[in-house]
Amino acid sequence: LLESRGLGDVYKRQVLLCSFNKRFLSIPKEILTLTMQSHQKYFPTFDNNGVITNEFLIVSNKKDQKGLIKIGNERVIEARLSDAEFFWNKDKTQNLVKKISELKLMNFFKGLGTYFDKVQRLRKLGGIISDELLISKEKVELSASICKTDLTSNLVGEFPELQGIMGGYFALHQGFDRDVSLAITEQYLPIGLDTHTPKKPFSVALSVSDKIDTLVGFFGINEKPTSSKDP
């Protein structure tokens, strides 16, 4: 846990309240929290409605009588968020449909082709499942077509944990239907026992398609999945 790591890393604990420029709040909250928690071991803060703020906490091993520790950490986070902001502004404008062809250059797994190959399989599986769920096949196939394109983005390269999530943001920003955006966001769910499952039918169709393709594919090449997580 971040709490135990942050407090355990210092002997004489001093908690300092810092802040960053409010303009960075336009960046998706997942990027902000990951930058603060995973990269810097900072503690983000939230208002009474659960909305992230521009203030964060750090744990220091000495008193900051001159305010230099506070200033130094604020400079560090602003530099990191400036990079994230640059990637966000660049990536969100990249046409997702045109990015599909780039998946031909990204291997999914040896023996299972590229991510482009996987996307074609997901389109077929998703179409079959959409017929069973009596939902729009067009939406499911569109979701499947662009669901892996965020893997080519700078942001997912920097924050691999955000694959799918960033794709959902990109799709929403580019005007795709909200069902399509949510399906992309939730395609990997559930990740483990402590995460929720997709509830919307389009999200269910894409998530199940992705897992079926992975399971059948790995058994097909005699690579039996062994994990505590869903494939």
Residue ranges and their predicted role:
Residues 42-44, 49-51, 55-63, 71, ...:
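Alpha-helical phosphate/pyrophosphate-handling elements in metalloenzyme active cores
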Residues 37-40, 51-85, 221-226, 230:
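Extended active-site and interfacial segments that coordinate phosphate-rich ligands
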Residues 9-46:
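Extended, Lys/Arg-enriched charged tracts that mediate electrostatic binding to polyanionic substrates
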Residues 24-29, 144, 177-211, 216-231:
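Histidine/acidic-rich helix-loop-helix segments that form or flank divalent-metal centers
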Residues 1-11:
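Single conserved hydrophobic/aromatic residue that forms the stacking wall/gate
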Residues 147:
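Active-site microenvironment for binding and transforming phosphate-containing groups
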Residues 51-53, 92-104, 182-185, 212-219:
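Active-site-adjacent bridging/hinge elements
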Residues 22-28, 34-35, 69, 73-87, ...:
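Negatively charged sequence features
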